[in-house]
From Swiss-Prot:
Signal peptide start and end residues: none
Entry protein name: D-aminoacyl-tRNA deacylase
Keywords of this entry: Cytoplasm, Hydrolase, RNA-binding, tRNA-binding
Species per Swiss-Prot/TrEMBL record: Rhodopirellula baltica (strain DSM 10527 / NCIMB 13988 / SH1)
One GO term describing the cellular component: cytoplasm
Recorded name of the encoding gene: dtd
Locations listed in the record: Cytoplasm
EC number assigned by the record: 3.1.1.96
Length: 145
C-alpha cells in the first residue's frame, strides 16, 4: 500500500464537474493498494496518517498531527501510484490490487481514519476525478508498507 500525503490549505475532488468531497486545512491522501495489502496494512497506515506530526506548532516546528491541527483528510483512491515504469514507456499497473479488493481496503482505511474522530470526505472509487489543492509548505510525504 502506498499513500501520498499532501498537507493542504484547502482541497476538493470533483467527478463530472461536481464537487464530491472537499476540505479546508488538512491532508489530501492519495491511496494506492497492491496485491499483498491487507486490513492490517490499511489500519497501520490509517494510524500513521492520523498521527503523523507534519503540522506546525506555535514555534513553527512540525509537532502537531492532523487531529491536533483541527484538520480533515480528503481520501482519494489512485491505483496509478502502483505504476511500474521500469520497462518501456508505458506504465504497467499489474502491482495494483483488483478493483473489488482495492475498494474493500480503501473503505477500511477510511473507516479506520474516521474512528479517530477525523472528518474524511472521499472521492469516488474508480471514477475519473479532478483533484484541486493548495499544497501547504509544500509538505508531501510518501507512506508505504
Amino acid at each position: 500500500m502506498k499513500i501520498v500525503l499532501q498537507r493542504s490549505q484547502h482541497a476538493s475532488v470533483s467527478v463530472d464537474g461536481k464537487i464530491v468531497g472537499q476540505i479546508e486545512r488538512g491532508l489530501v491522501a492519495l491511496i494506492g493498494i497492491g496485491h499483498e495489502d491487507t486490513e492490517a496494512t490499511a489500519s497501520a497506515l490509517a494510524d500513521k496518517t492520523a498521527g503523523l506530526r507534519i503540522f506546525s506548532d506555535d514555534n513553527g516546528k512540525m509537532e502537531r498531527n492532523v487531529i491536533d491541527a483541527g484538520g480533515d483528510v480528503l481520501a482519494i483512491s489512485q491505483f496509478t501510484l502502483l505504476a511500474d515504469c521500469r520497462k518501456g514507456r508505458r506504465p504497467a499497473f499489474t502491482d495494483a490490487a483488483p478493483p473489488d479488493r482495492a475498494n474493500e481496503l480503501y473503505e477500511h482505511y477510511v473507516s479506520e481514519l474516521r474512528k479517530t474522530g477525523l472528518s474524511v470526505p472521499c472521492g469516488i472509487f474508480a471514477a475519473d476525478m479532478a483533484v484541486s489543492l493548495t499544497n501547504d509548505g509544500p509538505v508531501t510525504i510518501i507512506l508505504e508498507l
